[in-house]
UniProtKB/Swiss-Prot annotation:
Name this protein carries in UniProt: Blackelin-4
Annotated site residue numbers, Reactive bond for trypsin: R41, G42
Organism for this UniProt entry: Pseudechis porphyriacus (Red-bellied black snake)
Location of the protein in the cell: Secreted
Function comment: Serine protease inhibitor.
InterPro entries registered for this protein in UniProt: Kunitz_BPTI (IPR002223), Kunitz_BPTI_sf (IPR036880), Prtase_inh_Kunz-CS (IPR020901), TFPI/VKTCI-like (IPR050098)
Source organism phylogeny: Eukaryota, Metazoa, Chordata, Craniata, Vertebrata
Keywords, alphabetical: Disulfide bond, Protease inhibitor, Secreted, Serine protease inhibitor, Signal
Superkingdom classification of source: Eukaryota
Keyword Signal: yes
Length: 83
């Protein structure tokens, strides 16, 4: 196989890996935590993974503390937690 063909194959495999959903066995434990606004009073739109619904949902984050099941974008949430 030519070097161009090998690069194409490597690129396709890398793309496939990036698009493969996270399996439940690979999902970080913090994805099971509930949404947690935290004690601060800010209004920040954030996303958390809801294990019962098996999807990422929006919630209002207060801006401090909370827990690790807190993502700035739905895409980041899906990449990390969604199966």
């Amino acid at each position: 196989m030519s070097s161009g063909g090998l690069l194409l194959l490597l690129g396709l495999l890398t793309l496939r890996e990036g698009l493969t959903p996270v399996s439940s066995k690979d999902r970080p434990d913090f994805c099971e935590l509930p949404d947690d606004r935290g004690p601060c009073r800010g209004i920040f739109h954030a996303f958390y993974y809801n294990p019962d619904q098996r999807q990422c949902l929006e919630f209002i984050y207060g801006g401090c503390y909370g827990n690790a099941n807190n993502f700035k974008t739905i895409d980041e949430c899906k990449r990390t937690c969604a199966a």
